[in-house]
């Protein structure tokens, strides 16, 4: 991390004293630049192309050095459109990697890959900046304790608990509640853990990024009246950006998250939507740089690039970065190298189900498809593990019986199976929960349910103590006491 002094009147552009080169070739977003002998820039140095296009408009394009070609030539990838550039234009070597603003000044704001604000809310305090390229924390700095990251969301905490400093894959199509779940997690980490969140929009639709920003303002995750009280920083490199920007925007978001972890010593939630687009952008850049493609046309450095990003997402003795990554699976092929490489890094998967969303059960997390490496007796304890397994067995049996019930009717199944079905339906409804960020839409106050309360609630349903209560009493409530109170009001 570097502290940049504030600009003064006497300050002449420091870039004038840097190495100067000239563009010799432009192929889309890739530039070849020649520098004077002995003045070659380092790999990952930021270069700036300044000049005017054919109509006299000012050009300011930032590039990143990717290859040293020999004969004093380098190859760089542009972070913005190269329209208007021409051979012979002057290129300035900044002498350092891309650096972005970090700290409290980033909260409530939207940035591009270069750390420039793009929300029309004025400049950002850039006195504290940090380079986007840095090493993963050393082994000695890592926190080796396996601890649960409590989210306050019943279905997640019980069946697919998140690891503090872990990586979670979020699978879900359009309209099943991915955005609302993301916003609730951002809200809960701020309230329960005193933490902040960073959202990295990598290669997704600009409209979705805009919708997320508007919904965050509406649900007060971003506080318009006092921007410093916001709980999230947003970094966007959407699908209309050049591949260089989409490849690096994840690192920009991660750099902002690392400052909150290492300097502010906070728990941070890092969202990456979509991790597949990070790989896709790397594949495009690799082809443009002339590398031989690997399996299915991906870059030969796929595993290294993914590891460089993922290994920086971890818990240290200062704080933690817990990452939730939306994963697009091309053609639903889980063996595709991009998702397969991602899975190797994940600690848990949260799968959203369209069937549950159609039933009105939100969050629509599929209890049988969602998994976690943390769900082991030695980590979560025997009580939690046993309760989770019994819940899964009940739901699995209900799933097996559904076809039979649809054909023959509920009267044709055994008494024991009827009891299983009744309890499974109560469990399914009890997984639903009113969210804080959805209060403005539903009118129901949000509920944060602690892990102990969650376990107690499901144990009571499984024990049969609540068999007499109607199943609608369990729908959209917080803890089990609210369900029993609701049942009293229903009768």
Swiss-Prot record:
The keyword Chloroplast applies. GO terms for cellular component: chloroplast thylakoid membrane; mitochondrion; proton-transporting ATP synthase complex. Keywords: ATP synthesis, ATP-binding, CF(1), Chloroplast, Hydrogen ion transport, Ion transport, Membrane, Nucleotide-binding, Plastid, Thylakoid, Translocase, Transport. InterPro entries: AAA+_ATPase, ATP-synt_VA_C, ATP_synth_F1_bsu, ATPase_a/bsu_AS, ATPase_alpha/beta_chains, ATPase_F1/V1/A1_a/bsu_N, ATPase_F1/V1/A1_a/bsu_N_sf, ATPase_F1/V1/A1_a/bsu_nucl-bd. It is found in: Plastid, Chloroplast thylakoid membrane. HAMAP family: ATP_synth_beta_bact. Produces ATP from ADP in the presence of a proton gradient across the membrane. The catalytic sites are hosted primarily by the beta subunits. This is ATP synthase subunit beta, chloroplastic. The gene is atpB.
């Amino acid at each position: 991390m570097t502290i940049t002094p504030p600009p003064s009147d006497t300050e002449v552009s420091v870039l004038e004293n840097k190495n100067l080169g000239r563009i010799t070739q432009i192929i889309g977003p890739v530039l070849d630049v020649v520098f004077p002998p002995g003045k070659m820039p380092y790999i990952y140095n930021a270069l700036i192309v300044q000049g005017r296009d054919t109509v006299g408009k000012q050009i300011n394009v930032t590039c990143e050095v990717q290859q040293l070609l020999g004969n004093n030539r380098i190859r760089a990838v542009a972070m913005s459109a190269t329209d208007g550039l021409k051979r012979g234009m002057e290129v300035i070597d900044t002498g350092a990697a891309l650096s972005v603003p970090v700290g409290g000044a980033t909260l409530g704001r939207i940035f591009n890959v270069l750390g420039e604000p793009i929300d029309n809310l004025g400049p950002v305090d850039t006195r504290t900046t940090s380079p986007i390229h840095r090493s993963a924390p050393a082994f000695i700095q890592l926190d080796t304790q396996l601890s649960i990251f409590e989210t306050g969301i019943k279905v997640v905490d019980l069946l697919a608990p998140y690891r503090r400093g872990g990586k979670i894959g979020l699978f879900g199509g359009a309209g099943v509640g991915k955005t609302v779940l993301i916003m609730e997690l951002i809200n809960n980490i701020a309230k329960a853990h005193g933490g902040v969140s960073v959202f990295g929009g990598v290669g997704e639709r600009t409209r979705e990024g805009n919708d997320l920003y508007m919904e965050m303002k509406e649900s007060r995750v971003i506080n318009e009246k006092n921007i410093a009280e916001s709980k999230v920083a947003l970094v966007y490199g959407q699908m209309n950006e050049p591949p260089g920007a989409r490849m690096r925007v994840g690192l920009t978001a991660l750099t902002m998250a690392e400052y909150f972890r290492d300097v502010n010593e906070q728990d941070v939630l890092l969202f990456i939507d979509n991790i597949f687009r990070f790989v896709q952008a790397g594949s495009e850049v690799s082809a443009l740089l002339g590398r031989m493609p690997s399996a299915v046309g991906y870059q030969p450095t796929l595993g290294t690039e993914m590891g460089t990003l993922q290994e920086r997402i971890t818990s240290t003795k200062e704080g933690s970065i817990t990452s939730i990554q939306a994963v697009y699976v091309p053609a639903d092929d889980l063996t595709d190298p991009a998702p397969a490489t991602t899975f190797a890094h994940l600690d848990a998967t949260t799968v959203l189900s369209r069937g549950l969303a159609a039933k009105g059960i939100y969050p629509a997390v599929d209890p049988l498809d969602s998994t976690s490496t943390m769900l082991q007796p030695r980590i979560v304890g025997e009580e939690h593990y046993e309760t989770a397994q019994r819940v899964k067995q009940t739901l699995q049996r209900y799933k097996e019986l559904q076809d039979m019930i649809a054909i023959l009717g509920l009267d044709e199944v055994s008494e024991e199976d009827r009891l299983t079905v009744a309890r499974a339906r109560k469990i399914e409804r009890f997984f639903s929960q009113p969210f804080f960020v959805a209060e403005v839409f539903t009118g129901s106050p949000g509920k944060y349910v602690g892990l102990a309360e969650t376990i107690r609630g499901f144990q009571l349903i499984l024990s049969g103590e609540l068999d007499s209560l109607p199943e609608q009493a369990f729908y959209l409530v917080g803890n089990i006491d609210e369900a029993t109170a609701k049942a009293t009001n229903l009768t």
